[in-house]
Structures are given as C-alpha cells and as structure tokens.
Amino acid sequence: MTQYFEIENRDGAARIGKLLLFPEIRTPCALHTAALGDLENPGPIVDAGSLWIADQKELEARIKEIREKTGKGTLIILPHQTYPPAVPAESTGKVEAFTATGDENAEAEGPTGSLLRAEGEVRKSDLYIMEGAGTLENNARRFLETLIDLKNRIPPDTALYAPKLALPENAAMLAYVGIDVMDDTRAEIAAYSDIYLTAAGSFYLDSLVEFPCRCRVCAATTPAELRALPKADRVELLSAHNRDALDAELALVREKIRTGNLREYVEGQCRVRPWLTALLRLGDFEYSYIEEKVPAFRQSQLLADTSEALSRIEVVRFARRIQERYAPPDLDVLLLLPCAARKPYSTSQSHQKFILALGKYRKFVHEVIITSPLGIVPRELELTYPAAHYDTAVTGHWDEEEKAWVSGCLESYLSKHMYKAVVAHVEGAYREICERVAEKLGIDVVYTAGESLASYESLTNLKNTVEAICTSKDFSRKSQNAEKEKKNFIKAVAGYQFGEGAGHLFSEEVGDPLVKGRFPKYQLFAGKKQLATLIPQYGMLALSPEGAELVLKSEKYVVKIDDFVPRGSILAPGVLDAGPEIRPNDEVIVLGKKALCVGRAMMSGREMKESGRGVAVDVRHVKKL
C-alpha cells in the first residue's frame, strides 16, 4: 500500500493513476531520464544514484540532502545496483545490504522507489522499478513472466516502472499489460543514431522524404534540412520529436483507457513488431492475471476484428460461464440459429422472421445462437454483456480458428445438455460447424434452411419441421408460457452473474417469484418485495437489499466492512474482506455489523483487500441492521 499513488481509471491491467508528488504525475507516463539525475534542480522523481559508482555512505548522505531540499513532494529512487535478469539472486547481496540500512529512514521521511527483480524480496515502497526491463525487449515470454511475478507480489495500488524500454510503437502494449511508468531513454538514444520514431515504427532519417508528423519540430523543417544540420543540432531536434511522439502516444493510450477500448487499439498496434504480437497472445494465455482486472462490462462496444479476439478475456469468460453457470430451460427441442448484425438478436429482421415462423410452437423450443467470436449465445443471455455489445467484420468467410473455437463451444454445450430433437436453421460455415459437432457426438440434426435463411421456402420448412416434432406422438410437450419464459430469462442472467448464488432468488423460501415489465425492462418480485431489476444497457441484474439478502447466502460477491453505516462510496481502506471472484463493475453485496448495502464494484476483490486508496464500491442502496 502507498499513500502516494491513486488509481483513477482502469481498463483491464492498464490504468490511469496519479503519483501524488509535486507536481503530480499522471500515469501511464514517460519520465525524462536526464531529469532523474538532476540533483541541483530536482523534479518530482529523483534517482539517488547507483551503487556501482558510489559507496553506501555517500548515497545515504545524498538521500538526506535531497529530502531536505524537496520535502515529501519528491519521490527518491533509492540507490540501486542493477543486474541483468540472468544474474542469480544470490549474486545481488549488495543492494539488499543498502536497503536494509537505508530503507526505513527514507520511507519515514517521504516517498521512495525501489528496484525489484524477479523472485527478489519485496520491500515497502511507493514505486517499484522492474530490474533489467530494457534487456527483455524482443523476449515476450520472459518479459511477461517477469512482469506477472512482480505484479503478483507487490501491492495492487502501487505503480510499476519499466525503465529503458518505451518507444512510441510499444508504449500502448506496455500500458496494456500493466506498466504504469516508462521513460524516454530509448527515444533519446534513437536520436543519437539518427532514428526517427513514430507509433507505426522507426525510420532512419536518411530514408525519409517527408515527416509523417506535425509536431513543433516536424512542422518547421524537412528531413533533408534536418540531415544538413550539425550533429548536435540534429540530435537536439530529433530528440525533441521522439519525446513528443512518445508523449503523444501515451496521451492517446490514456484516452483509450478512459473510453474502455485500449484492447481494440493494441490489437492493431501490436502488428508493428512481432514481439508485441507475441506479448498480446501470451497475455491472453495468462487468463487469471488479466481476467481478474477486466470489468464485468464496459460502456464501449467490443470490436472483434482480429484473430486475437477469439482469446480475448471477455470472450473466453463469456464462453466459460455458459458452460459452467448456465442452466437451460427444461425443453426437449433445441433450435440452432445464426447470429445477426443487430443486437440483441431478437430485434433483428432475420430473427423476427424466425420467431414469426415458429408461431405457437415457439414455446416448445429452446433457441441458441451460433456466433463468432462468442461461440454460442442462449436466447436468455442475448442481452448480457458482451452478447449485445460486440461487432465484427462480416465477410461470409470463417477461418479454421473460428470454426474450431465455435465448434468446441457448441460441442461442450451439447455434451452437457441433452435434447430429444435438434433443429438447425443455418447455412454456410454455421452448418459446417453443426455437422462437425453432430458427427463427433453422434447426434441427429435436422437442417431446415434452403438457399436463403429468410426465404419463404426456408421459413416454411422451419415451421413445418418444428410443428412435426412438437405434434408427434412420443413428444413430451414440455413448454414455457410467457411468464415462465420471462422467469427463465431472469434465472439465466442471475446464474451467469452470480453462479450458484442465483438459485436463492428462486428458492422455496421466496415462493413463486414473479417477473414484471416488458422486455428488456424486467423486474423480479417476491410478493410485493422487489428483488432485482434487469439493466438493459448491459443485461445484468441490479439487486435490491431484499434480493441481496438472498444471494448473500452463497457467500459470493460479498464485500465485508467494519461497524459503520456507509454514507456514499466505500473506500478501499474501509474493506475488511472481499470475495476473490469480484471483478470491476460486478454487482456486489456489502455486509457490516450495522449495514447491508448493494452497489457496483469499482475494483477487483483482491484490490479491495490490499489497496490503501481508491473507491472500492459505488453504493446504491443501504439498509441499516
């Protein structure tokens, strides 16, 4: 925990924060490396020096001098002795000896930064520096392993600094995986080598005909004019451009974090260098590290335009919850349908035609939509994020990765849930997927589509096929009326959202709950008590205190506080415990000795327990106990 860093916005592992120094520093940011060593005119962050070039006593005196001059408004990076990551930990004892004698006094007087190596001891600090970060460029696996090791061991509300690594081309990816602070070392070095930096990559100055930038340097000169300048003047101007390009990229990254679509940006930006693409893909494989930080829903649309969208956390989480938490209605006929451009699907023109064709037999049918990248979407979850909030490039062509992923989702579902009859009103790749799964599982699927899904012939065939199944002698005629359909809708959303805790909303204790309202503005009642409301914007439930008391029995999505009655948002220091399953934007139940509250989580459960600053829960209702 630190009192000098406050997180303001989150987008997965990326975040916008403030280093509470003088002046404040907004992160993610790039420090001016040359200014870190300016002891005469120290800025908000000062490097006390290296143990390679000065002894311990000299550096301790330097720390004291800096602190007396700047007060607590300056963060002092404690003396360090940097080693390449390959050097064994037992060979780095000298830096341990320094922090053991100098750390306590420095910490008591003001903010400090400490060097941290993989698997090394974590000491209390306000900024952690990733040792040897610059040597890990082009080694995505080693970089990510080191980063995750450090992130899992330091407090979640503390900033992490990766020195000597940032360029305009990789700054977005570094922020995406969780780096808060960078520097302009590489930008300065590039200038001395006549290298011109952009977010789209680097260029040698002698290869440029015109500048693809309109910064203060580029707008005032041309590549030919810059090449004609003396070396010192050329370096000065090129360095200014490179630093501006890095700062501009980080400003864009901060905006992407605010709007919640940094992922879409890095899916394109990572193409600049192969190691960045590898870093994105490896990050998706580290599901638990990233998933903990990804919100339950976003305000922005999810754009699935690349192959990496199939492994995106929101997509994988949705698919997993379908398999692990979703319970379909008790019906014997499954109807597989293709997705639609308009969301939710049931409002699209094509799905309206399917529904009209089913007519009175729709109540016997369970509808599941096949789609990429989400895999399958039961009709009851078509409103739930991200099912109604994604868009993808539609070409009519599915690559093998898409087919394999969606086939796997459908196969897992049909292996777990049995139907007496399966009808598929699909064509093209959708039909190929159904045929693959049917052959593998040994089930019969009836296909009803002709040349066009929405043609009169196809719709008539769909109607007649379903009618024939539902009127056959051996058909059990399990069905759901309008009221039961609405109840199944709410039950599915609750199960997706709360897991096993959702069952308490429909337990015998509640009796026979009633769903009121028209789609999508459903409300769940037990008698005259409102238990929950479906929020159409993201397709999840907002609990009332009465509903919270029921879900509370599962002991999931619970935040525990001390004996006080909240009067607004609950801050992280006020949290005693929080469920590890809690993600940002989750609906949570706050329980204390004097109050029961419901609200929205503003950070993960782990962050709530381990953070010293920031809003943990945005409280909506408070019930005094």
UniProtKB/Swiss-Prot annotation:
Its EC number is 4.3.3.-. GO terms for molecular function: lyase activity; RNA binding. It catalyses: 7-cyano-7-carbaguanosine(15) in tRNA + L-lysine = 7-N-[(5S)-5-amino-5-carboxypentyl]formamidino-7-deazaguanosine(15) in tRNA. Keywords: Lyase, tRNA processing. Pathway: tRNA modification; archaeosine-tRNA biosynthesis. InterPro entries: Archaeosine_synthase_1, ArchSynthase1/Queuine_TRR, DUF5591, PUA, PUA-like_sf, PUA_sf, TGT-like_sf, TGT_C2. It comes from the Archaea. SMART domains: PUA. It holds the Pfam family DUF5591. The keyword Calcium does not apply. It is an enzyme of class 4 (lyase). Residues 556-624 form the PUA domain. One of its GO terms (cellular component) is cytoplasm. SUPFAM superfamilies: Pre-PUA domain, PUA domain-like, tRNA-guanine transglycosylase, Uracil-DNA glycosylase-like. GO terms for biological process: tRNA wobble guanine modification. PANTHER family: ARCHAEOSINE SYNTHASE, QUEUINE TRNA-RIBOSYLTRANSFERASE. Belongs to the archaeosine synthase type 1 family. Functions in the biosynthesis of archaeosine, a modified nucleoside present in the dihydrouridine loop (D-loop) of archaeal tRNAs. Catalyzes the addition of L-lysine to the cyano group of 7-cyano-7-deazaguanine (preQ0)-modified tRNAs at position 15, to generate q0kN15-tRNA, a q0N lysine adduct identified as 7-N-[(5S)-5-amino-5-carboxypentyl]formamidino-7-deazaguanosine. Forms a robust complex with the archaeosine synthase beta subunit RaSEA. Formation of this complex highly increases lysine transfer activity. The complex likely consists of an alpha(2)beta(2) heterotetrameric structure. This is Archaeosine synthase subunit alpha. It comes from Methanosarcina acetivorans (strain ATCC 35395 / DSM 2834 / JCM 12185 / C2A).
